Amino acid sequence: CWGMQVAVTAGRGAVKKAASSHIGIANQIKMSVEGFKHPIYKNKKDNFNSPAFNFDEVVTLPKNSICLASNKINKIQSIYFTVGDTKVWGLQYHPEITYEKMISLIEFRKKRLIDNRKVFKNEDEIKNHIAFIKDEIAVSNKSQRMLELKNWLDNIKHYN
């Protein structure tokens, strides 16, 4: 997600603190019409969840950008744009990271999430949120969850 935010900033777009955040999971990500056509989402189901951890979001896209997916928290979950000959694919979420790693990150940042970020009121809320993520682990399909990474790797093979 930070990579997309840096690319957007370098491309003269804008990133700001989000009104809400994803803590361990982004729910109900939906592809745009353009997203259905983009190679990053080849064979991907339209409505999906993914590991995510972010407090900031893209609010202004660089010129010639296309929003490929969104959800209720971030209107821009994935993008595509070009800078010269460079093709930029960006994701706000993390298909490359497991939910288990996200749970570890939540546990590691527990005090900050309660005291500083005020995302959770107490440890019980965190435990409930972790249980929610564990429910997702039980129903998610790893190959489907990581498909964007596979599609990106398959695509860059064509440039070598």
Q: Model-derived features: where do they sit?
A:
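Cysteine-nucleophile active-site neighborhood
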Residues: C1-G35
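Amide-donor transfer/coupling interface in amidating biosynthetic enzymes
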Residues: M31-N160
